[in-house]
């Protein structure tokens, strides 16, 4: 197993994801760590790595809206709300949608909703397309440390053997904006 994900980085990353492990990859502003959203084992590994409580809920990042549909309930959206969301995607805006009862609690935490984003980062788009589904995505940093912005910073925080998809972040300074899909309420400024 090649932990450095050299050569065909996307195929190597998918191999790691299929082993229910966590990977790091560049996103719009910082490096993210992510895993298979359908694997409780993988999500628990990510939460342990980040020292993040399960009740906080997580974000899914996807190549397209279709990848997110199994995890969210968009039946209450009006045409105007859909237009607002789709005008911001793909891009650095995360929307919180109602979640159906079938969405695992290891993703939603204590909430009946799930934060999701359709990314515009080409490497993450390619990764999610090749994987065939979204990834759990949270900033690559250990508790109390700043988010990683380079491969070297990821290796400094998580160790030289941590699987990293090499690449550059999208250059944005701030993490994604987070808004409620139904009300438009701003939860986090981007």
UniProtKB/Swiss-Prot annotation:
Enzyme class: transferase
Disulfide bonds: none
Keywords assigned: ATP-binding, Cytoplasm, Nucleotide-binding, Nucleotidyltransferase, Transferase, tRNA processing
Pfam families: Sua5_yciO_yrdC
InterPro entries: DHBP_synth_RibB-like_a/b_dom (IPR017945), Sua5-like_dom (IPR006070), TC-AMP_synthase (IPR023535), TC-AMP_synthase_SUA5 (IPR050156)
Claim: Ribonucleoprotein is one of the keywords in the record: no
GO cellular component: cytoplasm
GO biological process: regulation of translational fidelity; tRNA threonylcarbamoyladenosine modification
EC number assigned by the record: 2.7.7.87
Intracellular or extracellular location(s): Cytoplasm
GO MF annotation terms: ATP binding; double-stranded RNA binding; L-threonylcarbamoyladenylate synthase; tRNA binding
Reactions catalysed according to its record: L-threonine + hydrogencarbonate + ATP = L-threonylcarbamoyladenylate + diphosphate + H2O
YrdC-like domain ranges (all copies): 7-190
Membrane-spanning ranges: none
Family: Belongs to the SUA5 family. TsaC subfamily.
Entry-linked PANTHER family: SUA5, THREONYLCARBAMOYL-AMP SYNTHASE
Function according to Swiss-Prot or TrEMBL: Required for the formation of a threonylcarbamoyl group on adenosine at position 37 (t(6)A37) in tRNAs that read codons beginning with adenine. Catalyzes the conversion of L-threonine, HCO(3)(-)/CO(2) and ATP to give threonylcarbamoyl-AMP (TC-AMP) as the acyladenylate intermediate, with the release of diphosphate.
The protein's name in its UniProt record: Threonylcarbamoyl-AMP synthase
Source species: Escherichia coli O6:H1 (strain CFT073 / ATCC 700928 / UPEC)
Organism phylogeny: Bacteria, Pseudomonadati, Pseudomonadota, Gammaproteobacteria, Enterobacterales
Gene transcribed to yield this protein: tsaC
């Amino acid at each position: 197993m090649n932990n450095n994900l050299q050569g065909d980085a996307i195929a190597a990353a998918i191999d790691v994801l299929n082993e229910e492990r966590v990977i790091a990859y560049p996103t719009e502003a910082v490096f993210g760590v992510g895993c298979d959203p359908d694997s409780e084992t993988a999500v628990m590994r990510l939460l342990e790595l980040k020292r993040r409580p399960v009740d906080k809920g997580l974000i899914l990042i996807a190549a397209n809206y279709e990848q997110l549909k199994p995890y969210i309930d968009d039946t209450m959206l009006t045409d105007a709300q859909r237009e607002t969301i789709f005008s911001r995607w793909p891009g650095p805006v995360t929307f919180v949608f109602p979640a159906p009862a079938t969405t695992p609690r290891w993703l939603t935490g204590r909430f009946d909703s799930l934060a999701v984003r359709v990314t515009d980062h080409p490497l993450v788009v390619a990764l999610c397309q090749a994987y065939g589904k979204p990834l759990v995505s949270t900033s690559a940093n250990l508790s109390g440390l700043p988010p990683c912005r380079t491969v070297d910073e990821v290796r400094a925080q998580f160790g030289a053997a941590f699987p990293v998809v090499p690449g550059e972040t999208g250059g944005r300074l701030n993490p994604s904006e987070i808004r409620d899909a139904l009300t438009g309420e701003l939860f986090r400024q981007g």
